[in-house]
Amino acid sequence: MNQKIKILHTIIFIFSISFPFSANAMTVEEIIKGRKAMFSENYQNAKKISILLKSKKIEEAKPLMKKISDNYKKLLDYFPENTKEGFKTEARPSIWENKDEFNALMQKASDDMIKFAKAIDTAEDLRAVQKELMWSNCTACHSRFRAPH
């Protein structure tokens, strides 16, 4: 009997980890802190990208661009209705009032990071490309969807 229970637990465990991440399984605190951590990681990586590009270390910057792109895609799942308040969120209500616009901006930011990674190989003005494909998305989102801090 104990052997059957162990097998059942193993099957349940394997089954549960084989599904993609779902914010629905997380608490409000975990979701809010998780999205804040991803945005913070994106900002830290964006600053690193600036330094790397200034030093002409283009290939070292590309994995950071991919990571930022991936985070933006993940963030689409980190704004359920029950996470509008609490845990020092800086998210404005406009996110939920204009969910399609917000999601489109997150998707655009993700797509633009991939474009950025490709464009830096041939761009003459790296700062201009960085401003257009990275920083402009940060500015657009912060001005519309993030509380002043």
Label each PLM-derived region with a short phrase.
Residues F19-T27:
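Sec/Tat signal peptide C-region and signal peptidase I cleavage site
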Residues V28-H149:
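Sequence context surrounding c-type heme c attachment/ligation sites in exported
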Residues H9-F19:
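Bacterial N-terminal signal peptides
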Residues I7-H9, M38:
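Sequence-pattern detector for short linear motifs
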Residues M1-K6:
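Positively charged n-region of N-terminal signal peptides that target proteins for export
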